[in-house]
Design a protein with these regions (language model features):
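Domain-level signal for Mg2+-assisted phosphodiester chemistry and nucleotide/NA-binding surfaces
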Residues: 1-80, 118, 122-124, 130
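Phosphate- and divalent-cation-binding pockets in alpha/beta enzyme and binding domains
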Residues: 52, 87, 111-112, 135
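A generic secondary-structure signal
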Residues: 30, 87-91, 115
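Internal catalytic-core helix/loop-beta-alpha segment
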Residues: 72-103
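Acidic, PIN/NYN-like endoribonuclease modules and their adjacent C-terminal/linker elements
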Residues: 113-155
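Short, well-ordered beta-strand core segments
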Residues: 63, 100, 143-145
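Well-ordered alpha-helical segments embedded in enzymatic catalytic cores
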Residues: 26-27, 83-87, 108
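Acidic beta-strand-to-loop metal/phosphate-binding motif
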Residues: 41-45, 99-105
């Protein structure tokens, strides 16, 4: 069984930065060992000047998928939801994965969970905690692992 992880980089970064930080190398190891992930996609923004961070993540065997950013009134805007959904769905149709791990709390991904369930592909959601997990995801009746409860494994 091939297991791919799809990480909503904005959600993970935003939440971990505001709470407790994350060691991406340890997080990758956790995904590989606990969930047997053979490929880990990290969807994130591309900001000029952050190339060393991207190289570091790539060296840790993350497959980086970038979204171009837009600066509006001095704030950087971006969203990789569509890219994550397209990559996950295409992986199923190309017979590259049979199980998915999705790291997010965003209810916009409820349709992706429905897709995996319809295709009878096991799916596990990793969300920050109960209050940072959309009701739309919670009601999908899939395994949800709360990162706050296992954060000691990747801090």
């Amino acid at each position: 069984m091939l297991t791919y992880a799809y990480i909503d980089g904005a959600n993970l970064h935003q939440w971990s930065k505001s709470r407790w930080g994350i060691d991406y190398k340890k997080f990758k190891r956790r995904l590989s060992e606990k969930y047997k992930c053979t490929r880990i996609f990290l969807f994130l923004w591309y900001i000029k000047g952050k190339e060393s961070l991207y190289s570091q993540l790539s060296d840790q065997w993350y497959t980086l998928v970038f979204k171009e950013t837009l600066e509006i009134e001095g704030k950087v805007k971006w969203n990789c939801d569509a890219e994550l959904v397209v990559k996950a769905v295409s992986s199923v149709y190309e017979d590259k994965t049979t199980k998915a791990i999705i790291v997010t709390w965003d209810g916009d991904f409820a349709c992706l969970i429905d897709f995996f369930k319809e295709k009878r592909h096991p799916i596990t959601l990793l969300a920050p905690n109960k209050s940072y997990c959309s009701y739309l995801l919670k009601k999908r009746n899939i395994p949800i692992v709360l990162l706050e409860e296992v954060k000691h494994k990747f801090q």
